[in-house]
C-alpha cells in the first residue's frame, strides 16, 4: 500500500475551512466522483468541527491511499480534549454534548466506508475514517 500524507492543525473555525479545502483537493487528486468528494468533505467538516469545539482543537492527518487498483482517502482526527464518556450513545443521531444537532459522529460514520473511534475521558479522542473511490 502506498500513501501520500499531510497533517493540518485544527485550532480555529478557519482551520475547519482549510481542512475541508485540503480534503476536497485530495479527493480530486484521488479521482473521486463528485458524490464521493461531497461525502468525505462533509464527514471531514463534521469531525474537524467536533475536534475544534469539543476537543479544544487538534490535528487531522490526510492520507491518499492506494491498495492495488483501489484508491482512497483516510482521515485521522486527534484531540486531547475531555474525551467521550459513552461512544455508543455519541454515535446515535440526536446526541449532543453542545448546541449542535447531534449528527456529527453518526453522520461521519455513515458517510465513510470504514470508521474507527478511540476515546478516553481526560485523554482525548481519535477518529479515523476511510472513503474508497467508487
State where each predicted segment sits.
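Conserved ATP-binding N-box helix of the HATPase_c
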Residues: 34-60
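Glycine-rich phosphate-binding loop
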Residues: 97-112
Amino acid at each position: 500500500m502506498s500513501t501520500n500524507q499531510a497533517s493540518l492543525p485544527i485550532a480555529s473555525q478557519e482551520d475547519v475551512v482549510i481542512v475541508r479545502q485540503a480534503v476536497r483537493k485530495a479527493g480530486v487528486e484521488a479521482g473521486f466522483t463528485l458524490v464521493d468528494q461531497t461525502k468525505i468533505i462533509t464527514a471531514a467538516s463534521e469531525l474537524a468541527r467536533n475536534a475544534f469545539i469539543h476537543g479544544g482543537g487538534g490535528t487531522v492527518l490526510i492520507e491518499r491511499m492506494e491498495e492495488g487498483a483501489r484508491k482512497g482517502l483516510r482521515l485521522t482526527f486527534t484531540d486531547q480534549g475531555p474525551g467521550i464518556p459513552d461512544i455508543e450513545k455519541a454515535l446515535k443521531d440526536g446526541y449532543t454534548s453542545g448546541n449542535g444537532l447531534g449528527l456529527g459522529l453518526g453522520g461521519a460514520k455513515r458517510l465513510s466506508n470504514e470508521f474507527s473511534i478511540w476515546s478516553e475521558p481526560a485523554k482525548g479522542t481519535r477518529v479515523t475514517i476511510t472513503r474508497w473511490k467508487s
